[in-house]
Curated annotation (Swiss-Prot):
<dbReference type="GO" id="GO:0003937">
    <property type="term" value="F:IMP cyclohydrolase activity"/>
</dbReference>
<dbReference type="InterPro" id="IPR011607">
    <property type="entry name" value="MGS-like_dom"/>
</dbReference>
<dbReference type="GO" id="GO:0006189">
    <property type="term" value="P:'de novo' IMP biosynthetic process"/>
</dbReference>
<comment type="pathway">
    <text>Purine metabolism; IMP biosynthesis via de novo pathway; IMP from 5-formamido-1-(5-phospho-D-ribosyl)imidazole-4-carboxamide: step 1/1.</text>
</comment>
<comment type="pathway">
    <text>Purine metabolism; IMP biosynthesis via de novo pathway; 5-formamido-1-(5-phospho-D-ribosyl)imidazole-4-carboxamide from 5-amino-1-(5-phospho-D-ribosyl)imidazole-4-carboxamide (10-formyl THF route): step 1/1.</text>
</comment>
<dbReference type="InterPro" id="IPR024051">
    <property type="entry name" value="AICAR_Tfase_dup_dom_sf"/>
</dbReference>
<dbReference type="Pfam" id="PF02142">
    <property type="entry name" value="MGS"/>
</dbReference>
<dbReference type="InterPro" id="IPR036914">
    <property type="entry name" value="MGS-like_dom_sf"/>
</dbReference>
<keyword id="KW-0378">Hydrolase</keyword>
<keyword id="KW-0511">Multifunctional enzyme</keyword>
<dbReference type="InterPro" id="IPR016193">
    <property type="entry name" value="Cytidine_deaminase-like"/>
</dbReference>
<feature type="domain" description="MGS-like">
    <location>
        <begin position="1"/>
        <end position="145"/>
    </location>
</feature>
<dbReference type="Pfam" id="PF01808">
    <property type="entry name" value="AICARFT_IMPCHas"/>
</dbReference>
<keyword id="KW-0808">Transferase</keyword>
<keyword id="KW-0658">Purine biosynthesis</keyword>
<dbReference type="GO" id="GO:0005829">
    <property type="term" value="C:cytosol"/>
</dbReference>
<protein>
    <recommendedName>
        <fullName>Bifunctional purine biosynthesis protein PurH</fullName>
        <ecNumber>2.1.2.3</ecNumber>
        <ecNumber>3.5.4.10</ecNumber>
    </recommendedName>
</protein>
Amino acid sequence: MTKRALISVSDKRGIVDLARELKHLGWDIISTGGTRLALEEAGVVTVAIDDVTGFPEMMDGRVKTLHPLIHGGLLARRDIEHHLQAAKQNRIELIDLVVVNLYPFKETICRPDVTYDVAVDMVDIGGPSLLRSAAKNHASVTVVVDPTDYPLVLGELASTGSTSYQTRQSLAAKAFRHTAAYDAVIADYFTRQAGETKPEKLTLTYDLKQSMRYGENPQQAADFYQRALPTTYSIASAKQLNGKELSFNNIRDADAAIRIIRDFKERPTVVALKHMNPCGIGQADDIETAWDFAYAADPVSIFGGIVVLNREVDLATAEKLHAIFLELIIAPGYSKEALAVLTHKKKHLRILELPFAAQEASEIEAEYTGVLGGLLVQNQDVVTESPADWIVVTKRQPNEQEMAALAFAWKTIKYVKSNAIVIANDHMTLGVGPGQTNRIASIRIAIAQATGQLEGAVLASDAFFPFADSIEEIAAAGIKAIIQPGGSIRDSESIAAANQHGITMIFTGVRHFRH
């Protein structure tokens, strides 16, 4: 009995060669619409789908493969006699191979000018149905959704006349993953269009971008998946210009660095980061000076760290970056001379190019945190704050320089692990106290790091001070300006202590915990 293949693809890569080889192996080919036209033009003889069904393609191609003569040929169990008898009685011929990929829905909705009606027209109905029918009956039917699998299938057919069960099972799993991901993108698009923010079911789809040697530690397996609808300003979309493949820890650190630099738009800024905490941030009128400030903030911790810049790297800055050991550099661009310096004798230095761009609110995706048995979903902490909304709660008002430093420190604090303290002036961090289980400990770490630079410095806290002892500790260091959310039942005690020591203190009303 002659074997039959059904071919209907949007992605026509390699399809002519596949069809020619199938014909050479003695297969009949059923095809549809544009696929059949492409094959016939290449000299491959096919059977039109409507010649099989006796029913014309209609409604602009919306109805063409949804027919019992097609799906019966896919779903009939070859090992069940009454299935075969039913097929014979109803003139259903068996189909042994399905090669289908789907309308480009994802690519369509990524176009900036796409209309809702055009998007709806790109929802494939017949294609997923064919894939699911073929995949369900993988005991007898081979289903192929990815052009990269054509050589595997042809190789087995040429060698043994059939595909192995293991291959059919693997390809069926791939087909189900493909249709699930396709539907997830459609569901996400319709959910957004309907303005729904809390769907009763959450379907996420990501594409494998990189298989890694290991994860956070060598004993942990890991892979990197990219969101199916790519975020334009993200580590996943960065272009690597030099160096070894990014590690799991590189990607997490780079993501943290990109999130920070996103908040510093107005002036040239450099962020140095280690273990997802900023160890130095500097801003200036030029990128070289901004680097000088970021480096001076903590010249010890930056060793083996990550640096992200929001301006093109010039030659002078590149020479300074090259002088120390870094894991990774991220910038919107590099001059030709700068790139030559950075790559000289540093073939392992990872260099990424990521054009700096402010994101629209609609482009900022939610954050997902896995927990045992579930998933936490929240908006990113990207609330827009204005100093005009802040309240000075002490007798002394901040002067202009203090206000600039407080704004800089407050912008920084939300990217430091809680309990978080940042000491800064108006152009650089001086001390960072991250991740302690009590606020006093974080204060002491930041003060110790900033020793000798506290004249005119300010301090930011990501959450309120529960007791006035924090203010006493800050006052003892000589710091005269504080910014914090407020909100403690003992705020009055902290305010009284600040007034006693001549400290100006601002309440923002916004907390910035980071776990």
